[in-house]
């Protein structure tokens, strides 16, 4: 097997053709890829009739990046922690560390968290770790929050900001949040239920590896910071297609982090409750209502809900839809092929159409599932796996 080298631009174009997302700027060194594991990949049973659920989420995108400032409502300090685009799970611990540090600076005797998605839950757990009693005020518990509709991929720069709208300090802040989150994820590896796990991801393309794709016109320039993490993530490997089961012109492989959303969220909820945390069901209609809480320091983790609650029109919805195929225990790798992403999880195999890149779903607030979209994505995969073979 020969070693291939690519320019950064060629690499990104190749990944885009395969449907790769997340850490898109992280140009990896290409290595000779041992094909032993690729020889024993299980095929996906890609049939539309195996879809048992379809969910839609609205990612809370802000051009300037997440909102992490503070404001006072009468005698109450509100610390904001929302607007993470498609990076909420990935940046959760790092962003919440910043928010909680601002909350603790007021030396409160107790802390309130509004919102019970992944940002709310990690904020609550970090405040508890600092010795503070915490009450989460929420309309929905975590298992029914928008966070549960995420794909489960580690994508810390997915729709995190626009390149020309962030402050000069933001790239370093993003790196700080990402590295802090990664240190926390490390502590969740190997736990029962595999809440966080390293898996292989295969980027399969019908185009030769060095094929260039013309840039799309009229696209927003979403920030991409993966190159700042080259010391952490494993090199990508170029595999000979003949050494893999895929009949394709180009096959690449790299290690990626995957979240088992169901088991991970249950673990976070359990930890919060064991530590004495309280959850109170409450819906806020005006920010001023937070001043009526007994806690005088509040961390606001309302996600896309902040657009209406805080009248923050800088929050733009980015619609995302995923279909769930019936789980296959033997299918344990992720895949990107023809603008379709596949992520194996214990609660279902996630299939997501990603054509259009980061602009897909931009400013679309529809929560209505599109069955045709999911069927088409699965049928695309069926064509790939219909030619699945034992490597020669």
Labelled PLM ranges:
Residues 14, 18, 54-75, 147-149, ...:
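Flavin (FAD/FMN) cofactor-binding and adjacent substrate-gating region
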Residues 278-292:
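A conserved short coil-to-beta-strand element within the FAD-binding core of flavoproteins
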